[in-house]
């Protein structure tokens, strides 16, 4: 795809997948800013960022920017869902959610990356100054960030962290493979619409559309469909373009 066409598609698609079309960040601005500040200032989060660099690369489908945004949004969801609970506890659980967000795709794009990534995550955080239960919550969240989760006999902190990670990840499934930056954190360098991508768009869109009913948290159930719809609007726009306008 030529640079001029990339720029044109970006201009066309930006209004469809902009922050303005997703009210989550506006409605929970205080919590989002708190999570974002925490992400950039907390020493343990900083340590985790350095630890995962060997596993996350800009040219992968699940890249550094995806991990970053999922981590911040998982922390935000934890703070939003925990309103009315002990603030100190929820800040700590927000930390766990952010670490899980950074780690969740360290073995992507392997088909079994959630399970294998959980094993690697356990090794990475083994020396972190966290309680055993907290480390288990991170590993549990990484292992279960893709599929439906049974709530039977699972420690509370595991569910809180796992649900926040799951929903934050799904927020961005429909956006991170589209050619439009969401705020300052969407990657701009990924190949956008090569031949393989064009062939996959309809099936991918159906898969993503089905995700609207799979969010686990109350906040995710309310706001998740906005993310889904923003990504779908962009995908449908690209799919409707003549192939000779999209392909190099």
Language-model segments: what does each one mean?
Residues 70, 90-117, 138-147:
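His-Asp-centered metal-binding catalytic motifs of divalent-metal-dependent phosphohydrolases/nucleases
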Residues 70-77, 113-128:
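An active-site-proximal "capping" alpha-helix that borders the catalytic cofactor pocket
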Residues 48-55, 99-100:
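Short glycine/proline-rich turn/loop motifs
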Residues 131, 135-139:
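Membrane-interface starts of transmembrane alpha-helices
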Residues 42-50, 94:
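Active-site-adjacent bridging/hinge elements
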Residues 1-38, 56-91, 103, 130, ...:
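Divalent metal-dependent phosphate-bond-processing catalytic cores, especially two-metal-ion Mg2+/Mn2+ enzymes
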């Amino acid at each position: 795809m030529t640079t001029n066409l990339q720029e044109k598609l970006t201009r066309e698609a930006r209004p469809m997948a902009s922050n303005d079309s997703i009210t989550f960040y506006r409605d929970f601005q205080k919590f989002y800013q708190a999570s974002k500040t925490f992400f950039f200032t907390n020493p343990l989060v900083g340590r985790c960022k350095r630890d995962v660099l060997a596993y996350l690369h800009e040219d992968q489908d699940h890249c550094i920017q995806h991990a970053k945004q999922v981590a911040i949004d998982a922390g935000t969801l934890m703070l939003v869902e925990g309103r009315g609970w002990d603030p100190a506890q929820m800040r700590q659980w927000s930390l766990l959610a952010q670490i899980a967000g950074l780690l969740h795709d360290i073995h992507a794009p392997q088909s079994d990356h959630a399970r294998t990534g959980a094993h690697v995550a356990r090794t990475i955080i083994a020396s972190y100054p966290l309680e055993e239960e907290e480390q288990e919550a991170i590993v549990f969240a990484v292992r279960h960030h893709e599929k439906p989760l049974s709530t039977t006999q699972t420690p509370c902190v595991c569910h809180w962290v796992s649900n926040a990670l799951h929903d934050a990840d799904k927020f961005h499934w429909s956006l991170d493979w589209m050619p439009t930056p969401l705020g300052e954190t969407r990657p701009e360098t990924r190949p956008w619409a090569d031949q393989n991508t064009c062939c996959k768009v309809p099936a991918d869109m159906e898969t993503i559309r089905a995700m609207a009913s799979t969010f686990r948290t109350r906040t995710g159930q309310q706001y998740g469909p906005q993310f889904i719809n923003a990504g779908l609007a962009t995908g449908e726009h690209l799919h409707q373009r003549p192939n000779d306008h999209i392909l190099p």
